[in-house]
UniProtKB/Swiss-Prot annotation:
SMART domains, alphabetized: RPOLD (SM00662)
PANTHER family named among the record's database cross-references: DNA-DIRECTED RNA POLYMERASE, DNA-DIRECTED RNA POLYMERASE II SUBUNIT RPB3
Native organism: Methanosarcina mazei (strain ATCC BAA-159 / DSM 3647 / Goe1 / Go1 / JCM 11833 / OCM 88)
Record-listed [3Fe-4S] cluster binding positions: 205, 208, 211
Name of the gene: rpo3
GO cellular component term of the entry, any: cytoplasm
Keyword set includes Disulfide bond: no
Cofactor: how and how many bound: Binds 1 [3Fe-4S] cluster.
Top EC class of this enzyme: transferase
UniProt name for this protein: DNA-directed RNA polymerase subunit Rpo3
Cofactors, names only: [3Fe-4S] cluster
Gene Ontology annotations of biological process type: DNA-templated transcription
Family membership noted in the UniProt record: Belongs to the archaeal Rpo3/eukaryotic RPB3 RNA polymerase subunit family.
Length: 266
């Protein structure tokens, strides 16, 4: 049985698609891979040379670490897995970002200067700190590749979730309209022949079954496909939504190949 993917919505930061002919365990595996197993770049160390702002050094370091960075997974690798330096830190596993600012004014993520032009803050307008007249901030930040399972700052996937594809059948409807009034999604339309749901709207059903509960004659039944899922995901900007989904699939593929290699040795 071959897996099927039907893309419903796709933008740089978000996607919605139907994943069919897979188990719930597989769908959850894709979700977990997006959140925890796709490595991203995030600031790990901060060397502060001058900080006369109102924020403590630790507060600044925390804010910097949570700024999403555009990640090039083909160029960089997690430091612990780096074959070039053995985890000591080198251009293959880390990026340097510098910042020098003087008040008055607000320091933004766009003020970080990266040693690699490809690695930039995913959003240039994230405020870091406001500097008053005479206040300064001079620092160097070191970004490492890491996994979301180790820290939230390395989570590329946000708001990743899925639900079963709904199946709704309507038979012998008396067009009372109770189901339409109760539906929180507003997808049920009542016509002279009875209630109906447009095919394009069916995917919006939240499976709450409120329509089913208020129908006195049991004309409407809500069910779902066990092997088809509506998948919704957002990226923090480290990757595009498309690239994050592909990278998550590659992670699952790599784990499966690793398992097969181990089994072949038995």
């Amino acid at each position: 049985m071959t897996m099927e993917v039907d893309i419903l919505e796709l933008s740089d930061r978000s996607a919605k698609f139907v994943l069919s002919r897979v188990s719930m365990a597989f769908a959850n595996g894709v979700r977990r891979a997006m959140i925890a197993d796709v490595p991203t770049l995030a600031i790990e160390y901060v060397n502060l040379y001058d900080n006369t702002s109102v924020l403590y050094d630790e507060q600044l370091a925390l804010r910097l670490s949570l700024i999403p960075l555009v990640t090039d997974i083909e160029t960089y690798m997690p430091q612990a897995e780096c074959e070039v330096c053995g985890g000591e830190g080198c251009p293959a596993c880390e990026v340097s970002l510098t910042l020098s600012a003087e008040g008055p004014g607000t320091v933004y993520s766009r003020d970080l200067i990266s040693s690699d032009p490809k690695i930039q803050p995913a959003d240039p307008n994230i405020p870091i700190v406001e500097l008053k007249k005479g206040q300064k901030l001079v620092l160097e930040a070191i970004a490492h590749m890491g996994y979301g399972r180790d820290s939230v700052k390395w989570q590329a996937g946000v708001a990743c979730g899925y639900k079963n594809v709904p199946v709704i059948t309507i038979e012998n409807c008396d067009a009372c309209g109770h189901c339409a009034a109760e539906c929180p999604k507003g997808i049920i339309r009542v016509e002279e022949a009875g209630a109906r749901i447009a095919e394009d709207d069916l995917i919006k059903c939240s499976l709450c079954r409120l329509c089913e509960q208020v129908c006195d004659i049991n004309a409407i039944k809500v069910d779902f496909y066990e092997n088809a899922f509506v998948f919704t995901m957002e990226s923090d900007g480290s990757y595009t939504a498309k690239d994050l989904t592909i990278n998550a699939a590659n992670v699952i593929k790599g784990k499966a190949e690793e398992l097969l290699a181990i089994l072949d040795q038995l």
